[in-house]
Amino acid sequence: MPASKSLPTALLGLALACPAMADAQSMELGQVLIGAEETSGEDQAVEDAKVRLDQVAGGTNLVDMRRPLQGKVASNQDVLAYQPGVYAQSAGNEGVKISIRGSGINRAPGAHASGLYTMLDGLPLTGPGGTPYELLEPLWLDHVEVLRGANGFDRGALALGGAVDYVSHTGYDAPRLQVRYATGSHGYQQRQISSGQVLGDFDYYLAVTDARSDGYQDHTASQSQGVIANFGYRFNPNLETRFYIRHRETENDLGGRVTKNSIEHTPRAANPAYVSRDDSRDQPGSTFIGNKTTYYIDDDSSIQTGLVYHDYPMDLREGPNRLKVAYSDVSGTFDYKRRDTLWGLESRSTVGLRVTKHLPNAGASERVRIPTGNTAGYAPGTPIRNFTYQGSDTVLHFGNDLEIADDLWLTTGLAAIYTRRESAVTYPQSGGKTSMNDWDYAPRLGLRYQLTPDLQLFGNLSRSVEAPHPWSLIYSSNIRFPAGSGVATGAQRDPVKLQNQTATTLELGGRGDSVIGEWSLAWYYAQVRHELLSVLPDANATTPYELNASPTVHQGVEASLQSNLWSAKDGGKLSLRQAYTFSDFHYRDDQRFGDNRLPGLPMHYYQGELRYDFPQGFFAAVNTQLVSKVAVDYANSYYADPYATFGATLGYNAPKGDWQTWLDMRNLTDKHYAATVTPGYDDKGLDAARSTPGEGMAMYVGVSWSLL
């Protein structure tokens, strides 16, 4: 598909030309996609986030939710659109596959995410078992901060993909009352009512949200409902605290993975096995309770502490057996920040501690749901196995930014990490147990140079560390209960040991403003050891194995450009925003696969939107997404096809900011394509069921009203 190569190439050329064309206009540095074209003076949280991200010696993104909310926003696919370096695609529900710099490259959509450290309002959401998605309700968000790769170091993030912080509204930036409703194709409906206010030294934000959809693919109906509340209090100018509460329930029918032939000819068809079993994935009620307290010692130093309780059970009916999973974590954080003078040079230091631990009840119970194979002859509900998931992550990190010359900052850092993982089969009694613990380290060295007010260059060399999930220790085992073990015959018996994944990454890049627009550009190269890769043993499997790979390479380019193409005398404006991600992930002389590409992600990923804003508040936009082919197995014997989709939006933002309406039209050509790929080992060139279909042509309409 020539277009999928020419547009990203043109974008990259423009971004490379930006330093030469930098003009003298003042600017705010950083990758920022703002919401409505006017910046609200009351949204100080977004402005503060821009300043923080400007000071990072590496690639970052800032998403102001005012822009995505001018269209359908149902999942992370909508929140993280048009973000360089971020791949986010949905399998038709909230279980979005997210990858940054190849993190969780072959994780299946709907599973707990890997390779990213995810936060809610700066507090840990990610636990030893990965990152659940059900609490990531987009309508609750004020903005999202993304620190790609090792650039999440000062947040305590040591994963390959970096850190993502979902920041919710508070009483300081929310309307006193807001009502939002959206509806559209495939039975989609979304409703929310929210309120936020500042009452003296106290403020609050409260929202109730629900959504439901029949789904594009057969047997992918979903529904959800949830509530969020946070309450803040300022005791005095030096001391403030905020409590956070989130609770949400989701139910998702599963259509399963299908073949390329099925997507081409019957794109809405589900995998027959999933339909016959009535497979589903329910989160019956996830709860997140946290507190963050900040004490400003003086104008130059502060201490912030955080505490979280996170309970997230699951009811998985994803095969012939039923798995009820209990997950509960507790987390604590401590951060000390200081700005002072070191050897006569301006210095900014951070010392942080992050601890997350599974509680003793974490584990799973597996029972017969549909008697078949080794469970034939046993009644539904018969216990098969009980097993435990235990783990903890402890990260102590120190970072410093030192201005060693005018506008030249040296970044140094060192983190120590202690990880513990344990899994045991407690029923039947002949089950095994595996326990692992490991100390590791992650240094960081970087430079950031403000060459002109409109041009910043940066580079860094960093190390990342990621431990396996406890569940992968049992599901990756090839040691099974022998014949004669009753209903447990053939089930994994002894958990296995896996090594921590580590990587050393070099990053170079820059960001700035020029005559062609606001731009960002980053190149990175990572040598990864013991990469934790997942593989489905066969096309009918529902749970992947996870294994340590031979050495791999992750390298790529991340570029964005936001341009004001034309301004009319009456105040109208024509703008273009573009994001391009080049990803080259491959083995290094693997004994079986040589230098094969790692499957699951495209090499080229481009998104662009051309938009005209009328002075009266109306807007109209057209958009496109171009994606190259994707390998579906480690042997690279078969590929999902490249594709291009096109869409358009129309809407109106009232000048007073009190109401808006929009029409979001997607995939106008009704293109049939694979949205996500969950890799197999070696399909020998056959068209195996590895892909989930992307949404066909669809239209959505929405309206919101606010009492300001």
What is the predicted function of each stretch?
Residues 234, 340-358, 387-528, 611, ...:
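Structural signature of Gram-negative outer-membrane beta-barrels, strongest in the C-terminal barrel
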